[in-house]
Amino acid sequence: MIDFSIATASDAEAIHELNYLTFTEEIPQHQPNIERKRIDRFHDQNTYLIGKEDDRLVAMIAIRKHRPFSLEEKGVTLDETLTDPAEIRLLSVRPEYRNSRTFMQLMRFLMVYLERETIDHVYISGTTREAKLYARFGFTPIAATLGSGDAQFVPMLLSRATYERSVIADVLRPLHFLAGPVEVAPTVRQAAQQAPRPHRTASMRQLDQDLRGRMCQLLDLPHVSMAVGSGTLANDIVAQQLSGHGLILNGGEFGQRLIDHAARAGKSFDIHLLPSGHPIELEQLASQLHQTEYDWIWLTHCETSTGVLYDLDAVKALLNQRTALIVDAISAVGTGRFSYAGCRFVTTVSGKAIGGLPGLAFIGHTSSVLPSSRIPRYLDLGLYAEGVAFSGSSNLLLACQAALDALDLDQAAIKMTYLEQAVRATGFNLLATQEAQAPGILTIVHPSATALGDALRIQGYHVQYESDYLVRNQWLQISTMGQTTMRHIERLIRVLVRENQRITIKNEQNERPLNP
């Protein structure tokens, strides 16, 4: 197994040896020397992306951001309209490792690095013997061939756009273990590719009615309204419906966002803080409810940031008849069998555990809602009561229908149970206690969460670790929402354990990147 990482100071000698092997002995670009080492003239400016097997350097790419680039020194005119491009100074793979798998892994590492560094364009002098291989990855020639004999090179440019259109991009696309956007079933993609329907036609109205009916069944509520937008829109719509004095339960980043929704809507409310990673302390909540009579309580069913699922039935039992329960169920719906019967408003979306494409916001409610001239039109829940209220996308509705057809709530629970047990058994520190663990997403507390997330992505597994609140808390999240399989999860766990061990060793050795 080849491990990919950014080179440290201890890798320098091996880099010089591989540079010599490739660009002196194999490609006669430089004169031989007794030491059989070649130090790149821009070595101190290079960032080296390397692959090692059993501690032996087998592949590398050197990235340089400083102008002028090598091609410019050779007289090639570069596009001056590009923002902060870079160049690949060296690209080398040992002959015995020149199979498509090694090169593809190296290229995936390159694309992860370029994205992290916000580099959209990179130049290379590609050897003519590998020009077809470069083209498969999206490199395009920009000038005539340079050099002579066995040392001929084609000036080429790779952009994120040409990479995404390349024949290899789908092969290298990582598996998503995200809470959104999620991996979708092939039938969902196929449904989304149908010809769009005008939003005022009878077929569109029927599609809208059918989908809202299925969502009523899923939520166990008599009414569901649908808007084109995100979960943020759904919660903004709900905030407009709140009146009187309320209580917001805040157990993390998304509880905090409910506070922001209510504050922006000018609502009156108190805040009840929940312990991070733990169930609701019912006695404390009951005490606050006893002290103040609230018109509504708003909480997240699944607090996505911590991976905690709150007990709605326990909260319901504490409320009197006049207190409305409002639920953000965006990361809960589709992860298990839940009834939201009796909840005044419930929000969810198409692009999370339901498994559809992002773009549909659902608001479930216990009773019909009339339009109000005091509410901005797009935030007026009453305008959505009869179905299609504004311009919408039939493709999103068709994709969501296909996602509901593919949704297996029992399998969702099995996958998450296996993942949680396996991760706990390997010694990782999970933020949520076992009794509070959500069935769709878990949060790992790790001192090198960002490095671990990068390592997983390089290996082809995209988990959540880049949001500001995750970086700030050193958290990494794995979600089983969407079309993940048990085989995918088993492979992810093996890679997770291996990369964690590698990072731990590197941290113990206090290794730092070469040329940081």
Model-derived features: where do they sit?
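Short amphipathic alpha-helix that is part of the acyltransferase structural core
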Residues: M1-R38, H43, Y48-V58
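Conserved acyl-donor/pantetheine-binding loop and adjacent beta-alpha core of acyl/acetyltransferases
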Residues: F42-N46, I50-K52, R56-R98, Q152-F153
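Acyl-donor binding region in acyl/amide transferases
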Residues: K74-A151
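Active-site phosphate-binding strand-loop segment of PLP-dependent enzymes
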Residues: P279-I330, G334
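Conserved PLP-binding catalytic core of the aspartate aminotransferase-like
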Residues: N429-Q459
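PLP-dependent enzyme catalytic core of the Aspartate aminotransferase-like
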Residues: L476-P516
